[in-house]
């Protein structure tokens, strides 16, 4: 995966205060940065008053310039003391030159009264790379979405309205590239009639730009030595509203439990329906699953999703608190087993990723990390590892707002007014405001989603017991398959890939394929474990014909084909949506990496909240993309990015 040019902030320290060498300016007031933040951004967006009386279930702040995170921490502190306990704060901040972890820690140490908040931020402020990253605090009540890159490139990729804007960053005279007409126009595009803004600057170019974009602008007293500042509100557009209600999620694997969890976190009462007597019985039922990103040399959607999902899953697992018996960050070595793979790995390693995310290691270093002799160098992911899928699913489904209906197969869905009725045979099982279909290939069994081109792929894993006295593998090894480190006295390796095969009996020939992979990846380990008869498990995974998941709202495909829409200025309004019906499926063998972030995408879209990824990626995952392309309507492939009617 190719990433944009990326560099961390170049800081100087003047009398203990951070100073930007690039912009030639300070990050905050030398006299009282805290009071300046509270005066400019909190007070002049009327946040305390708005939060004390807010009716919606979430509030979104968008900031230009994260800097030291001071504005975020002050907003979080005020939120905790003024907002109702059941609502959420989304703080979206765009930063071109993020501080290193060490510099951020040093800067935030200047504000001891914020220590509890800065400590929580620093605990998650790792592996910060270009693009979208979501950090979650207070059991989901506070969410920070960091957008690393150029503000004018990233701002159009937002997927929700802002309730308040923090126009920070450096002064227009120091940072003219940011303070452009495009900034103000994009602000207008993502504002509603109650959206406010505040900024420390009173420059004429800013005042005129905001007014031209539709903002009512006031010049008021600044803070300290700053005589004037600007604040105001947007004058157009109504804010869409969405309240949590009742949801049914179909499917008890990683996609279904993650979807249930993200909705439950937002106050939904969720009925999680699974046809088996327990969760995680099919593709999510393997004893061990691996968690790592599969990156490409170039910026392709699958690589972008893989990286975003990997980082999201690492943070989610940390929040869930799975113990060492269920999850371990043992590190992963992606072996450069031939010349093509060597070039791919080294190209990725040279793209500027932080070393704590990935870096190249030579053959000797790889062997030292693994604990066994290896024949190849590798791309090393220090935080990658393994997880027990069943424990993961149980933790996700353990939310107090989730009830489980097990050993029950959903056979049909029907609309009844503004609700969805969920049927098992002739019996009405439930009635809900929204339904999320997350039952793998069985999603295509419903009339409403039978147009989804899902494919089934058999995969078999093999387990080999450790031999006493032999070297122990400590890290995850990957090529086209994987070998786990030693877990419960055995190694897990796999998985085979057999498209179109839906049988689940264990086969000797597929054990042989896995053993051949082991022999090629780690011959020294193979020699110590053979001869030995492996045990194993086979399951059927679900993928799409283009190997990208299907995530988003569902169209009425029959009506679409009967009456294709004409071109309109608003493509979302021209499509026959099935309001309240969503799908999260087709994750294939990468479900542990991609399904949780897909669930977060769905929940955010339902609530008009900022997405954890850019709008281009949301569009790529549109579950209706195949039928739209078939009808020559490729321009309407938008999915979650186009804000269809939610109910």
UniProtKB/Swiss-Prot annotation:
Keyword S-adenosyl-L-methionine: yes
Named cofactor requirement(s): FAD
Region feature (tRNA (mnm(5)s(2)U34)-methyltransferase): 1-235
Sorted UniProt keywords: Cytoplasm, FAD, Flavoprotein, Methyltransferase, Multifunctional enzyme, Oxidoreductase, S-adenosyl-L-methionine, Transferase, tRNA processing
Gene3D superfamilies hit by this protein: D-Amino Acid Oxidase, subunit A, domain 2, FAD/NAD(P)-binding domain, Vaccinia Virus protein VP39
EC number: 2.1.1.61, 1.5.-.-
Pfam families linked to this entry: DAO, Methyltransf_30
Molecular function in Gene Ontology: flavin adenine dinucleotide binding; oxidoreductase activity, acting on the CH-NH group of donors; tRNA (5-methylaminomethyl-2-thiouridylate)(34)-methyltransferase activity
Region (FAD-dependent cmnm(5)s(2)U34 oxidoreductase): 250-647
Biological process annotations from GO: methylation; tRNA wobble uridine modification
Cellular component annotations (GO), alphabetically ordered: cytoplasm
UniProt entry tagged with the keyword Cell membrane: no
Protein's cellular compartments: Cytoplasm
Family: In the N-terminal section; belongs to the methyltransferase superfamily. tRNA (mnm(5)s(2)U34)-methyltransferase family. In the C-terminal section; belongs to the DAO family.
UniProt cross-references to HAMAP family, sorted A to Z: MnmC
General function of this protein: Catalyzes the last two steps in the biosynthesis of 5-methylaminomethyl-2-thiouridine (mnm(5)s(2)U) at the wobble position (U34) in tRNA. Catalyzes the FAD-dependent demodification of cmnm(5)s(2)U34 to nm(5)s(2)U34, followed by the transfer of a methyl group from S-adenosyl-L-methionine to nm(5)s(2)U34, to form mnm(5)s(2)U34.
Name under which the protein is recorded: tRNA 5-methylaminomethyl-2-thiouridine biosynthesis bifunctional protein MnmC
Organism: Methylobacillus flagellatus (strain ATCC 51484 / DSM 6875 / VKM B-1610 / KT)
Species lineage: Bacteria, Pseudomonadati, Pseudomonadota, Betaproteobacteria, Nitrosomonadales
